[in-house]
Structures are given as structure tokens and as C-alpha cells.
Amino acid sequence: MRVLGVDPGSRFMGFGVVEEKRGRLVHVGHGVIKGDPALPLSDRLRDLHGALTAALVKYRPAAVAVEGVFTFRNARSALVLGHARGVALLAAAQAGLPVFEYAPAKVKKAVGAGGADGKDAVARMVRTFLELDASVLERADASDALAVALCHLNHGRAAVPAASASGKKRKGAAALLADRLAPAYRRPEAR
């Protein structure tokens, strides 16, 4: 299954595409769509919509996963983010794709980062899961979007047994994520 994850924003909208293929998580692509802050918001949203639609056509995902809104102290920032999320939801709906939304805390948890962990921890875990070099993910927007896609691949498959004491082989995205997490949590001297 191929999933396009979206980290919405009106200035920088990250997208990341991950596919579960023959028991492996494969990085298909990612990018950051830049909105011109000099443009009126309506024009910026139009441009974001066009670029995200182009990504949907290029990568042909089976589903779109969008990060939800978190609590803001600034109401204006929350409204603008809501508009950017609306653009992502609209582009997916126009493409006829199912859309799934995940809270930021759930996304962090899905990749093994905790609530207090920052974007660097999320990026590090995404690189671990997808076996990417540090130089590949330049912006947090792209790594956050890949984390949202990983969250979707893991969500709903948690019922798959992670591993048994008998050593039976694990299956599904949840097991793949667990396998990739194990080395990341080893102490440096144990690596």
C-alpha cells in the first residue's frame, strides 16, 4: 500500500510517500511545497493546492494521511493552518482518495518519538525506519510528512503480533516499524 503523508502549512507544506511492499517499508519520495509569503493567502493556498495535486498525480498513492491541528495560543495561526489543511483535504478528495487524519502526538508515538521530543527526534526515527542518509531530509516538514505516512501504515495494523517468544516471523507495517525501532534504542556502545 502506498501512502502520501502531509504536514500542512501555508508557508511550507511537507509531503512524503511511503509504500509497504513485500514486507518492507520503502521511501518513494518526498518534498516541501513552498508558499510565497509575499502573496495574499488565497493565492498561496491556490499554489499549494496545485503543487499538492501534482504530487498526487505523480506518486499515485492509495491513501492520504494528514497531520491534525494541535493547540495554538495564536488564533490567527490556527486559522491559517486550518486553511492549509483544507487544501490538503480538498486535493485528496478531488483525486478520489481516502483521507485519514492523525493527531501530532499519535504521529510521534508511531515513529517512536515521545511527546517532549522535538522535530529532530522525529526526523532521526524516520531516517531509521526508511534507511535514509541524514542529508536526504533537509527540512522537518518533509520528515514530519513521512512520519504521518508511517503512522497510517502502522495504524489499524497494531493487532498484528509483533513477535512471539518462539521467534515466528512478524508481518505487517507494525512489525516492520518495531524491527526498525530496536537498533535505534540500543545504547551507543552496544551498536
Curated annotation (Swiss-Prot):
Sites where the protein binds Mg(2+) 2: E67
GO CC entries: cytoplasm; Holliday junction resolvase complex
Catalyzed chemical reaction(s): Endonucleolytic cleavage at a junction such as a reciprocal single-stranded crossover between two homologous DNA duplexes (Holliday junction)
InterPro entries given in the database record: RNaseH-like_sf (IPR012337), RNaseH_sf (IPR036397), X-over_junc_endoDNase_RuvC (IPR002176)
Catalytic residue positions: D7, E67, D141
MF GO annotations: crossover junction DNA endonuclease activity; DNA binding; magnesium ion binding
Compartment annotation: Cytoplasm
Cofactor remark from the record: Binds 2 Mg(2+) ion per subunit.
Enzyme Commission identifier(s): 3.1.21.10
Subunit field text: Homodimer which binds Holliday junction (HJ) DNA. The HJ becomes 2-fold symmetrical on binding to RuvC with unstacked arms; it has a different conformation from HJ DNA in complex with RuvA. In the full resolvosome a probable DNA-RuvA(4)-RuvB(12)-RuvC(2) complex forms which resolves the HJ.
Family of this protein: Belongs to the RuvC family.
Identification of the protein by name: Crossover junction endodeoxyribonuclease RuvC
UniProt organism field: Myxococcus xanthus (strain DK1622)
